[in-house]
Amino acid sequence: ISAFVDMMNEKLAELGCQESHFENPSGLNGDNQYVSAYDMALIAQAAFQNETFVTIDSSLYYDLPPTRLNPDGFRVYPGHRMLKKNTPQYYAGVIGGKTGYTMLAGNTLVTCAEKNGMKLITVILNGHQTHYTDTKALLDFGFANFQSVNIADADSTYSSVSNDMTIAGLPAADLSVLHMQKDCYVTLPKT
């Protein structure tokens, strides 16, 4: 198990997570296990780029095969209520996410939703029975006030940089022209 936890922490570093550390694979509380909302959003962003993950996470139920104890099989329902049309928490456009609860952490909810081609990720930590309403409020605000813009729509060359400009500590000589992929989107406030 410790080797797997080491891999989890290596992945945190690879994703740019700086305020999180795992000491067990379950996500349950530990003396040296902690996570920030920002880091959870980075983890979710990476997860929701994986099509297999999205297929599994957006499923409304899983049918487990028959066993000796359950000869008819067993149906398991994931806990994210915003996916389920028959619940008051349903939210059109939710792709998936992760629910959680411990006495120490309270209710936690990570959610990915898409509307008009823009994906948003929300993270609620230490919620107190308001994690779904807080998530809805964040999604409503995000979709109402922001838009996803293709910044490379007109040209693949976005900008030239002058000799005295630096980006993230790199001298301009290393960045004479910035190029964008065709599908390079940025989320901006609506005007």
Predicted regions and their residues:
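Short, charged, amphipathic alpha-helices and their helix-cap/turn boundaries
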Residues: 2-20
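Domain-terminus/edge residues, biased toward the C-terminal soluble/receptor-binding domains
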Residues: 17-21, 31-34, 38-191
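Diglycine-centered glycine-rich loop/turn motifs
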Residues: 24-25
